[in-house]
């Protein structure tokens, strides 16, 4: 629930400065999973996770519940090819719950022109990530079209 704090007025120290915010009633949660104390990726995109977030929004009586699910990172256990399956599950959850249709505003996928990733040193392939592995363009296009059909 720490992520929901941005909707409220805050006061904190930042690099020696006393900072006060007005809060942001339009703030949203980004669900990218997490890592436990053993280094294991722990996803948070499942139906139960989304419903728990919805309940936290309701308990705090927040006006604009909003979440975006990151289909990669810890939600995919850093296995980028799992992104289409994760997006499909999120869409399935939205179809079966009016609350989740209100809550989940979108998904994030990591994609680039070429699939995978490459080291920054040496010869590089144009359009291939030098950071996280990504879906290639064809898989991304297919995923977007499938999402449009299911939405």
Question: What spans do the regions from the language model cover?
Answer:
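Conserved, mostly hydrophobic/aromatic
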Residues: 69, 136
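Structural preference for beta-strand elements that scaffold enzyme active sites
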Residues: 26-30, 66-68, 104-108
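Active-site beta-loop-alpha junctions enriched in small/polar residues
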Residues: 32-36, 72-76, 107-114
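Short, small-residue-biased leader/transition segments that mark boundaries at the very start
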Residues: 1-8
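Structured alpha-helical segments in the cores of large, soluble enzyme domains
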Residues: 9-20, 46-62, 90-96
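Positively charged, amphipathic and often flexible ligand-engagement surfaces
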Residues: 18, 23-40
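Short glycine/threonine-rich loop-to-helix capping motif typified by GTGT followed
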Residues: 75-87, 117-122
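Substrate-binding cleft of secreted/luminal carbohydrate-active enzymes
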Residues: 90-116
């Amino acid at each position: 629930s720490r992520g929901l704090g941005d909707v409220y007025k805050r006061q904190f120290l930042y690099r020696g400065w006393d900072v006060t915010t007005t809060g942001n009633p339009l703030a949203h949660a980004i669900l990218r999973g997490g890592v436990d104390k053993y280094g294991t990726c722990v996803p948070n995109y499942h139906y139960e996770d989304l419903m728990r977030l919805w309940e936290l929004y309701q308990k705090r009586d927040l006006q604009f519940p909003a979440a975006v699910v990151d289909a990669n990172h810890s939600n995919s256990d850093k296995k980028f090819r799992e992104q289409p399956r994760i997006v499909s599950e999120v869409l399935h959850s939205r179809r079966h719950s009016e609350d989740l249709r209100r809550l989940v505003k979108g998904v994030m996928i990591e994609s680039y022109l070429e699939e995978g990733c490459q080291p920054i040193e040496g010869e590089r392939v144009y359009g291939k990530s030098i950071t996280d592995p990504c879906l290639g363009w064809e898989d991304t296009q297919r995923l977007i079209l499938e999402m449009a059909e299911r939405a």
